[in-house]
Amino acid sequence: VPTVDALAYNLWGSADVVCPLMDARRQQTYTGLYDFADGRMNTILPQCVVMIEEIVDKINELGRRVIFLGDGVDVFRDYINEHVKVDYDFAPAMCNKQRASAVACLGQVLYEQGRAENAADHKPEYLRLSQAERERQEKERDFRI
């Protein structure tokens, strides 16, 4: 179950666009955009890592009310307050952390859709390289020049 999707699932049934924000450091956030209709969660923007400016621009383009949640809310609250042009709100603090119940419920939905895998085939899906990997690539690039 993708982490950002599971965080969004904490607000299952919301009438608003749901925007999870997980602090990825350096003004970046792990995020995505979701809504709920016809008894299911729909992905507007799949989970990704972007600069906070990029997700705010996308939200403003959508033109719909949005609710933010996640540990990135506290990090980016001032930026959101200054730059989001649509109606928005922040989820209650109790919704800002991963919940095993949301992961399990979303996992069941994915299983019913045939999107299951066995433990031997499971591999984590990293949205970006680790800092050590990025620094190694940078050094290798500098060495080639």
Where are these regions (language model features)?
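Surface "functional belts" at beta-alpha junctions
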Residues: 1-97, 112, 126, 131
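Acyltransferase
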Residues: 89-145
